[in-house]
């Protein structure tokens, strides 16, 4: 029977509940347990697919095509289990499900209320999500509840967790509460009062934390931990100090050294071997002792909020980890390049244009792509970054001066990137798509296997087949592919049924390393295994750096 650990937060959001949950999962997995994770989001949106990156950060796409919270990316990077649609749900999905049941008459004429109907539905979703991994035989499911204790939106989720604890009985459910212990510079001391109030609020709901994770910018002294334990009504060793570190991959060791996994296993009556975190120790050692250093320019319009590119940033770090390279990322606002001033690109070892939506900043990205192509700087374009590379190539090398995407100009003379107006949905039914279609859930989503053309860079990286995740509406227009290929572009991977371009590259005679991909490879990169595409990209950046230094000598 699966046991549950609920991870809650207090005082403020963005303390790192997702990292804490993922780190605990990694420790338990290293003890030989089968672990899965769930994220419960209290907002009313059905999913984050239509939310602004400035509001929500990155949208993480699962193998089965769900648009989910970015914390699921942390989960996949820290544990071996793959997340699915069932591993993330929102208030919107809960209410949608309950209302459908009410309309079908499943409640037999009863008044539908938050308690018990909404809370029962939340519990059903939690148990369904826990069964989605390990063939339904997970030993532990770690359930992160978004928001903070005291939020109106979070109350039904916390009540559902309390009810699950009561229903399942002793030693079946544990609670880890993450809270803030701020350092007040003017007083020169850490303040525990916000944490005391947060735990008090949680206990009012009927939940007593098993462990308390106290976030601070420095280690919390024992006397402060003793004070917290007294007011929180829990043993001092269950008050865990979680301080700021330079890499999130140190967190599993930090929590393990303070006995968090021991506390949880004792509460749940789980017997398991000691944790073996040697892989994480080796990872941290490699990160702290690189042999090389490069700078990659990431050109986008969400650069002021790097959470928008969380998986991509981590994928680049993973590639650095597997090439013993410190990867520095310089974030470049694409709108600042639209005036033609590209001097900021001169010191870069490689250029990357990530995925995105909308017209704003696209001409600046195209200038960066042109710079990379003409100067021989390694280039990687992801999703929109590939589409813009096709537009740049069409304009300057294929004789289509006004080439564009219909996303930006629906009257363009050469729509080299266009909307696919007819797709098969997940059930195999024809689904019409147009510019007027709903935005939510109407993209090509999830993993797809695609054959790769032999003798290409893509084949050297991936082998005969690529299996990556997608999140996009627009595609490279097949009508223009012959003209692009005649001008020198190589389409190195195509979808088997629609024959749509999935990867493009330039031959070595035109550029040393220029690759665009329609999918999102960052979603499958992990610190343990890295990713072949990002590894090849970092190696190309190192080669470019060495050639530049050799030429300058």
UniProtKB/Swiss-Prot annotation:
Recorded GO terms, molecular function? ATP binding; CTP synthase activity; glutaminase activity; identical protein binding; metal ion binding
- Keyword Magnesium on entry: yes
What residues does Mg(2+) bind to? 71, 144
Residues at which L-glutamine binds: 356, 384-387, 407, 473
Q: How is the activity of this chain controlled?
A: Allosterically activated by GTP, when glutamine is the substrate; GTP has no effect on the reaction when ammonia is the substrate. The allosteric effector GTP functions by stabilizing the protein conformation that binds the tetrahedral intermediate(s) formed during glutamine hydrolysis. Inhibited by the product CTP, via allosteric rather than competitive inhibition.
Keywords, sorted A to Z: ATP-binding, Glutamine amidotransferase, Ligase, Magnesium, Metal-binding, Nucleotide-binding, Pyrimidine biosynthesis
Could you share any additional remarks the record makes about this protein? CTPSs have evolved a hybrid strategy for distinguishing between UTP and CTP. The overlapping regions of the product feedback inhibitory and substrate sites recognize a common feature in both compounds, the triphosphate moiety. To differentiate isosteric substrate and product pyrimidine rings, an additional pocket far from the expected kinase/ligase catalytic site, specifically recognizes the cytosine and ribose portions of the product inhibitor.
Official protein name in the record: CTP synthase
Can you name the source organism? Ralstonia pickettii (strain 12J)
